[in-house]
Amino acid sequence: MNPLVYFSSSSQNTHRFVEKLELPAIRIPIAGTREKLRVEQPYILLVPSYGGGSPVGAVPIQVIRFLNDPHNRSLIRGVIAAGNTNFGDAYCLAGKIISQKCQVPYLYRFELLGTAEDVVNVRKGVTEFWQRQN
């Protein structure tokens, strides 16, 4: 199965969610590494939303840099977003922004660490998505 590519800050919320999925996954580095992540196969991006509800800063800068590489951007096939419902209309805004800019489906969204139901839904949805692609 193709991997998830994900970003998680030092809070590790997104990382903990990805671990529960038990799916192949590659993490976009937080910082401090000179080597850029370059993917070699199609992937689904899993991204948290930041910025406190503002479109400015909603997508983590590390994710922007990753997607600014034309090779990486050419392999994205879908996006899943984590967010906080306290942000109102900006809940999971990073997923909406990336879906629109990269013209890929916005597959799922979940709050903070996600629930057991979110884990089941994402695992099933990702598996079915790749089956339809092949």
From Swiss-Prot:
Segments passing through the bilayer: none
Pfam families cross-referenced by the UniProt entry: Flavodoxin_NdrI
GO molecular function, one term: FMN binding
Stored SUPFAM superfamilies: Flavoproteins (SSF52218)
Classification via InterPro entries: Flavoprotein-like_sf, RNR_Ib_NrdI_bac, RNR_NrdI
A GO BP annotation: protein modification process
Family: Belongs to the NrdI family.
Protein role: Probably involved in ribonucleotide reductase function.
Protein's UniProt name: Protein NrdI
Organism per entry: Yersinia enterocolitica serotype O:8 / biotype 1B (strain NCTC 13174 / 8081)
Gene expressing this chain: nrdI
